[in-house]
């Protein structure tokens, strides 16, 4: 390295240390999905960034979805995936696919990219995600809502400096498996662990005033402003439950929550190191 390159690198490290300080030896929960999960190159970048954070002393818990793989598996059975209000209708065949693809293939492919630092888990392990059938006007089948998060296994992994990689399947008191929304799982785990930050990766720039115009990105939202944005129709559709998970986490004592654009290279690092990415939710 030339002298000026060394100096530039040192300055970069110094700046990064300032932004990283609040998170060292703290827990960050990352909900991982969307385009950053489908694109193999971006997937590798995300895993590299998570490994880097682990090496820098940040305790990362990774919660992942796997919608495209599940839909592909359902189609191989000769069925069409069904969604109502953004939630997957999960019959017996579909929950079997969820267990095979989400808790199996998808989970282990992510663990493999973490080079010995990842440990693959699902909510059934040690009753981590105790749930019950989701009660709604529509019968979604084997879709659950969380009753309790048992953190013992997660705390054990984190204390060993490992990265828990969690697929979003829970279990009820009869041993029945349920599919659970990944944003909900990430938020509930973050609250149960007392995490400092919740990060949700999406396929969009963040919260937009005009959902067809990414230049209308809202970079920051104080949680007391959320209801007004819902009333204005700015927060609508699938963003309502996603943002509700963020506000629940913050109101439970979390420092901040980010909805970030997973299409941006190194999106997690950008959000932690003071860069502009997505929408930050916080409480005064």
From Swiss-Prot:
Primary location class: cytoplasm
UniProt KW keywords: Amino-acid biosynthesis, Arginine biosynthesis, ATP-binding, Cytoplasm, Kinase, Nucleotide-binding, Transferase
Compartment(s) of residence: Cytoplasm
Record-level GO cellular component terms: cytoplasm
Enzyme Commission code: 2.7.2.8
Binding site for substrate: 66-67, 88, 179
Annotated site residues (Transition state stabilizer) in this chain: 31, 242
Name of the top EC class for this enzyme: transferase
Similarity field: Belongs to the acetylglutamate kinase family. ArgB subfamily.
Function: Catalyzes the ATP-dependent phosphorylation of N-acetyl-L-glutamate.
Protein name: Acetylglutamate kinase
